[in-house]
């Protein structure tokens, strides 16, 4: 009965509660009358409790509105799983340029008992997949979406609120509208510039949402996505199966086939999530858990494990040399990444990832790093294999006071996916098939050979840079929920944020504000955010590094740090104008 009551009630925020002055006076007089009549102790406290509200958990994401919705779930008696589902569905509505139900991703979960689970809800190649290439039609670039199944798995195993309750904020936001803010405007402009075409206004299916009055939505406008609201409502009422069969599935298949796609209803009906092994290391005594292939969690762990061998690392006076060592570790790790692929299709992948984290490999890399110079690409990648680049993505972190912690990253790949909007459902389809390596008989980009471990096959999942991580103190208590969005910067950003938290003991917002550097080996140059220290960059140039600059917009991380007193410190990346972390508080009650 309680669940039914919750399901029927609208979300109520504390700001909605209003008590007039007259009502307060009347209530006070009534209480005084009762005290006078029955002689109750005169020392009783009236009004709200003076104690600080209890923290129920926290949420961090690329949009403060969605983080607020996640926190609402915690304040309504839900847990971190409920918060994650509500937040991710919301991000798909307002941050549709990065993610949505037409995509997929990876999720790392720490249960209250301390067990870890890696849930792979990455898109899969359709059964009729053909060789991909530069001229592949848009319809062939979409993989079978996994986000809805991933959230279903999380909710069924860990959630406590009804499914319809956790979807309600996203449905309401899509139906009633949301404010067009700076980040959305920025990504709209980037997508139009990238394609050279204003598809958001000129294509009828996109224009319904993005140009309802004939011109593109602008900063401060209210934007609605009513077709998507109806789709989410169907998923809310009929369950996740409604996405993978029936009218919603038929619309996805038809929309893709109209532009040369091969996805079938059978592909959608057969989609399943996969639970995989996690990767674990110790770093400065902290226990770090991440994911495995086809994600790049093992690569992030390799970088950190190499850097753990240096005693003086980002201590006073060592910043320049520490940055060089970190970049060198990145280059060796990305060389190892060239042989990663979907373990369900690549024989020996588990053994290879164990080798990546073995003492022998770590010692080999450490001995190969010179403090006096960098090296040619062949030293890090002797097989000459290409480095696959991922794009897009949105990262979310949630935690509750019972110890359930989740780090999840979801994506439709490049901005607005493959730029196909399903006509009837408002779903934006992914272009995840572009993350597969492409066989070629001609010299490939940068002169490197495509990796056969990441060639497309029916049902296979492409390699990804996604690297969610959860870090525990040496005593086993929760310290940090980390992860990032933004192409191959995901892996290196996650590493640097962990270093900032552990080695430099920074607060959440300080971690995220720290300038970043990225090196993925191919192309062979270190990319520095324009806010990076010039002296450090000059030092690296003297060691032989090719350096380039990039605005602080390549990677977006959102994380939750747990303070020494057990309080939650969530934060959104300051590189985004509208990101945010929210702490969920127990609602105060009258005595």
UniProtKB/Swiss-Prot annotation:
<feature type="signal peptide">
    <location>
        <begin position="1"/>
        <end position="41"/>
    </location>
</feature>
<keyword id="KW-0732">Signal</keyword>
<comment type="pathway">
    <text>Mycotoxin biosynthesis.</text>
</comment>
<feature type="binding site">
    <location>
        <begin position="464"/>
        <end position="465"/>
    </location>
    <ligand>
        <name>L-glutamate</name>
    </ligand>
</feature>
<dbReference type="InterPro" id="IPR043137">
    <property type="entry name" value="GGT_ssub"/>
</dbReference>
<feature type="glycosylation site" description="N-linked (GlcNAc...) asparagine">
    <location>
        <position position="534"/>
    </location>
</feature>
<feature type="glycosylation site" description="N-linked (GlcNAc...) asparagine">
    <location>
        <position position="270"/>
    </location>
</feature>
<comment type="similarity">
    <text>Belongs to the gamma-glutamyltransferase family.</text>
</comment>
<feature type="binding site">
    <location>
        <position position="432"/>
    </location>
    <ligand>
        <name>L-glutamate</name>
    </ligand>
</feature>
<feature type="binding site">
    <location>
        <position position="122"/>
    </location>
    <ligand>
        <name>L-glutamate</name>
    </ligand>
</feature>
<dbReference type="GO" id="GO:0005886">
    <property type="term" value="C:plasma membrane"/>
</dbReference>
<dbReference type="GO" id="GO:0006751">
    <property type="term" value="P:glutathione catabolic process"/>
</dbReference>
<protein>
    <recommendedName>
        <fullName>Glutathione hydrolase</fullName>
        <ecNumber>3.4.19.13</ecNumber>
        <ecNumber>2.3.2.2</ecNumber>
    </recommendedName>
</protein>
<feature type="binding site">
    <location>
        <position position="411"/>
    </location>
    <ligand>
        <name>L-glutamate</name>
    </ligand>
</feature>
<comment type="function">
    <text>Gamma-glutamyltransferase; part of the gene cluster that mediates the biosynthesis of the secondary metabolite ustiloxin B, an antimitotic tetrapeptide. First, ustA is processed by the subtilisin-like endoprotease Kex2 that is outside the ustiloxin B gene cluster, at the C-terminal side of Arg-Lys, after transfer to Golgi apparatus through the endoplasmic reticulum (ER). Cleavage by KEX2 generates 16 peptides YAIG-I to YAIG-XVI.</text>
</comment>
<keyword id="KW-0325">Glycoprotein</keyword>
<keyword id="KW-0012">Acyltransferase</keyword>
<feature type="glycosylation site" description="N-linked (GlcNAc...) asparagine">
    <location>
        <position position="135"/>
    </location>
</feature>
<keyword id="KW-0378">Hydrolase</keyword>
<dbReference type="GO" id="GO:0036374">
    <property type="term" value="F:glutathione hydrolase activity"/>
</dbReference>
<dbReference type="Pfam" id="PF01019">
    <property type="entry name" value="G_glu_transpept"/>
</dbReference>
<feature type="active site" description="Nucleophile">
    <location>
        <position position="393"/>
    </location>
</feature>
<dbReference type="GO" id="GO:0103068">
    <property type="term" value="F:leukotriene C4 gamma-glutamyl transferase activity"/>
</dbReference>
<feature type="glycosylation site" description="N-linked (GlcNAc...) asparagine">
    <location>
        <position position="389"/>
    </location>
</feature>
<keyword id="KW-0808">Transferase</keyword>
<keyword id="KW-0645">Protease</keyword>
<dbReference type="GO" id="GO:0006508">
    <property type="term" value="P:proteolysis"/>
</dbReference>
<dbReference type="InterPro" id="IPR029055">
    <property type="entry name" value="Ntn_hydrolases_N"/>
</dbReference>
<dbReference type="InterPro" id="IPR043138">
    <property type="entry name" value="GGT_lsub_C"/>
</dbReference>
<dbReference type="InterPro" id="IPR000101">
    <property type="entry name" value="GGT_peptidase"/>
</dbReference>
């Amino acid at each position: 009965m309680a669940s039914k009551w919750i399901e029927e009630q609208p979300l109520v925020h504390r700001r909605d509660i209003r008590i007039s002055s007259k009502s307060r006076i009347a209530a006070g007089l009534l209480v005084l009358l009762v005290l006078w009549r029955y002689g109750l102790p005169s020392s009783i406290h009236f009004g709200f409790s003076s104690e600080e509200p209890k923290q129920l958990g926290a949420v961090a994401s690329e949009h403060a509105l969605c983080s607020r919705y996640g926190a609402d779930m915690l304040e309504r008696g839900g847990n971190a799983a409920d918060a994650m589902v509500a937040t991710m569905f919301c991000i798909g509505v307002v941050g549709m340029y990065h993610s949505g139900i037409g995509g997929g991703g990876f999720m790392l979960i720490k249960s209250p008992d301390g067990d870890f689970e890696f849930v792979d809800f990455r898109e899969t190649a359709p059964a009729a997949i053909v060789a991909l290439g530069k001229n592949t039609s848009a319809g062939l670039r979409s993989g079978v979406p996994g986000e809805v199944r991933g959230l279903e798995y999380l909710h069924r195993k860990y959630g406590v609120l009804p499914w319809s309750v956790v979807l309600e904020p996203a449905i309401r936001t899509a139906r009633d509208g949301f404010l067009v803010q700076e980040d959305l405007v920025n990504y709209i402009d980037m997508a139009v510039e990238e394609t050279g075409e204003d598809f958001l206004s000129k294509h009828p299916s996109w224009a319904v949402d993005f140009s309802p009055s004939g011109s593109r939505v602008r900063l401060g406008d209210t934007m609605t996505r009513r077709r998507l609201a109806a789709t989410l409502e169907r998923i809310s009422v009929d369950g996740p199966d409604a996405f993978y069969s029936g009218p919603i599935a038929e619309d996805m298949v038809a929309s893709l086939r109209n532009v040369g796609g091969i996805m079938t209803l059978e592909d959608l009906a057969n989609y399943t999530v996969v639970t995989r092994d996690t990767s674990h290391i110790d770093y400065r005594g902290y226990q770090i858990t991440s994911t495995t292939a086809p994600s790049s969690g093992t690569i992030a762990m390799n970088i950190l494990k190499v850097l753990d061998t240096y005693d003086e690392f980002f201590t006073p006076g060592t910043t320049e040399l520490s940055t060089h060592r970190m970049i060198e570790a990145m280059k060796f790790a990305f060389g190892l990444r060239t042989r990663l692929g979907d373990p369900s299709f690549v024989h020996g992948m588990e053994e290879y990832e164990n080798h990546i984290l073995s003492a022998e490999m770590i010692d080999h890399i450490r001995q190969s790093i010179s403090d006096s110079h960098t090296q040619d690409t062949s030293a890090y990648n002797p097989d000459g294999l290409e480095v696959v680049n991922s794009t897009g993505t949105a990262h979310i972190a949630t935690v509750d006071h019972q110890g359930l912690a989740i780090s999840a990253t979801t994506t439709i790949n490049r901005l607005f996916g493959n730029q196909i909007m399903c006509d009837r459902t408002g779903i934006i389809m992914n272009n995840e098939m572009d993350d597969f390596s492409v066989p070629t008989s001609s010299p490939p980009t940068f002169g490197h050979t495509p990796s056969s471990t990441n060639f497309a096959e029916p049902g296979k999942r492409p390699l990804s840079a996604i690297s969610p991580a959860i870090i525990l103190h040496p005593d086993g208590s929760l310290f940090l929920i980390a992860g990032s969005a933004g192409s191959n910067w995901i892996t290196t950003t996650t590493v640097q944020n962990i270093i900032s938290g552990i080695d430099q003991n920074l607060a959440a917002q300080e971690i995220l504000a720290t300038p970043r550097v990225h090196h993925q080996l191919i192309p062979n140059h270190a990319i520095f955010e324009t806010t990076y220290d010039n002296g450090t960059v000059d030092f690296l140039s003297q060691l032989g590094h090719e350096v380039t600059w990039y605005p602080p917009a390549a990677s977006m991380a959102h994380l939750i740090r747990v303070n020494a007193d057990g309080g939650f410190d969530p934060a959104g990346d300051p590189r985004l104008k509208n990101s945010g972390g929210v702490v969920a508080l127990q609602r105060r009650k009258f005595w």
